[in-house]
Amino acid sequence: MKSKYLDNTEVKKLRSAMSCEEWLPLWVSLETGLRVGDVVKLRPRDVQKDGIHYVAEKTGKKGIAAIPQILRRELSERKGKYIFPSYRSADKHLSRQAVWQRIKRAGKRAGVDLEGLSPHAMRKAFAVELYRKKGFKVVQEALQHTNTATTEIYSFADWDTGENANLPLRRRDLRLVVRMVLEALGEAYKMPKESQKKGKEE
């Protein structure tokens, strides 16, 4: 079973099939883990010396996402109401759907498996790489997840081989398999106590 996320090679292929303008919002998501819906709403004032200041639309949580200097310079040069203005009006931001169309077109040109493509593609790639390097807790904090089950999804990026797994393999496999089977049967999956916190996440 192959996880639905883009590996480094696929990300590079996708980048090569896009213009700089098309790639920029995805680059932000890849570097920060921000949802595309939050990226497209960014304004020039949100880009500061310590990173991107944002409020997550789904949770209402405030955060500061660190970004490399080269990306900060690129974003700082953007003028207008929004960093990513709509094609139709500079007073409106680019839509999530427009970004999704860009991803699909670039994916087809690059020959990337469309199964791994979605508006969340860069957020997933960010989470998987961060999980491999820093572990579960760091990813949970970076993505602002209150429900540990949501973060655990990213720990299964290599669940077919168990490579780079920081959680006990038996526990990880069992939990995901049970969840998948019950959801397929239309049954609710009752998470362990530490995972029952409510929150709007993805």
How should these model regions be labeled?
Residues 35, 113, 146-149:
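Short coil/turn motifs that cap or connect alpha-helices
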Residues 46-49, 135-155, 160:
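Short, polar N-cap/turn motifs at the start of nucleic acid-interacting alpha helices
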Residues 57-76, 81-105:
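C-terminal catalytic core of Y-nucleophile DNA break-rejoin enzymes
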Residues 29, 40, 140:
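The alpha-helix within a helix-turn-helix
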Residues 4-36:
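Basic, Lys/Arg- and aromatic-enriched nucleic-acid-binding interface segment
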